[in-house]
């Protein structure tokens, strides 16, 4: 859906959609094709009005298969929280951006799924919910990666679910798997699952189970380079004209 909206917002631009998970990428491509007319599908890569249709690439954010200085906008929606090396991803975003290009993204902050973490704490001593990065640390990463004028913001959104199964099923559908170092190595048994469901039901309000999502918003620009590729500082000298 977002890919189609970006293509509609920038009709003369070439949109490249990247995802490390091939099934998610295939779903995005199918949704994009459903949103296009028969004529647009027949035109294939030329899209409508001469604009290129979106390209779909299976790739990792920390190793983009794109040449340097080739895009004007990097748009990332709820992806960075699944990346193990976020500074490296930011460095890759900056590498492919043109000078004056914009990075804009959303990700999850530390208070995300705090209710689920509390419920799991009653079940065992393992870590089940990811440790999401604070927005101030993300801002520092942007600066260290060479971005200019970073702006960060956040909001807390609480979604409620009718049952533990509904909550856990939705988390699975968005790819929220447990990749923390403290995760249990064995499968979740029936007893542990029942204990988790009971702990979640104990947190219910008005018969619904809350799940908090701390959504972090950020954007930053790629400014003029301050150093050469050899690491030497770039000093600009302007000639003054005598009046």
Regions found by a protein language model. Give the residues of each.
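Conserved catalytic/acceptor-binding region of the Class I
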Residues: 100-166, 173-187
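C-terminal lobe and adjacent flexible extensions of AdoMet/dcAdoMet transferase-like proteins
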Residues: 165-243
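Class I SAM-dependent methyltransferase SAM/SAH-binding core
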Residues: 1-67, 73, 87-88
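Short conserved AdoMet
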Residues: 11, 84, 98
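A short glycine-rich, Lys/Arg-flanked "PGG" loop and its adjoining helix->strand segment in the class I
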Residues: 87-102
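A short SAM/SAH-binding and catalytic strip from SAM-dependent methyltransferases
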Residues: 72-87, 107
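Short alpha-helical
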Residues: 1, 23, 81, 110-111, ...
């Amino acid at each position: 859906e977002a890919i189609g909206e970006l293509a509609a917002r920038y009709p003369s631009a070439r949109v490249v959609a990247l995802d490390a998970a091939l099934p998610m990428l295939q779903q995005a491509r199918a949704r994009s094709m459903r949103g296009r007319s028969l004529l647009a599908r027949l035109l294939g890569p030329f899209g409508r009005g001469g604009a290129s249709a979106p390209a779909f690439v299976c790739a990792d954010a920390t190793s983009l298969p794109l040449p340097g200085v080739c895009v004007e906008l990097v748009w990332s929606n709820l992806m960075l929280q699944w990346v193990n090396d976020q500074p490296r991803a930011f460095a890759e975003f900056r590498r492919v951006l043109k000078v004056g290009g914009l990075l804009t993204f959303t990700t999850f902050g530390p208070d995300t799924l705090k209710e689920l973490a509390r419920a799991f704490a009653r079940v065992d001593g393992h870590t089940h919910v990811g440790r999401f990065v604070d927005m101030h640390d993300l801002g520092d990463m942007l600066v260290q990666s060479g971005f200019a004028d970073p702006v960060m913001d956040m909001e807390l959104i609480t979604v409620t679910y009718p049952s533990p199964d509904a909550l856990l099923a939705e988390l699975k559908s968005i790819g929220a798997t447990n990749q923390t170092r403290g995760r249990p190595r064995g499968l979740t048994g029936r007893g542990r699952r029942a204990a988790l469901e009971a702990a979640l039901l104990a947190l219910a309000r008005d018969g619904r189970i809350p799940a908090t999502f701390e959504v972090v918003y950020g954007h930053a620009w790629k400014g003029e380079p301050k150093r050469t590729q050899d690491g030497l500082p770039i000093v600009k000298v302007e000639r003054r004209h005598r009046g």
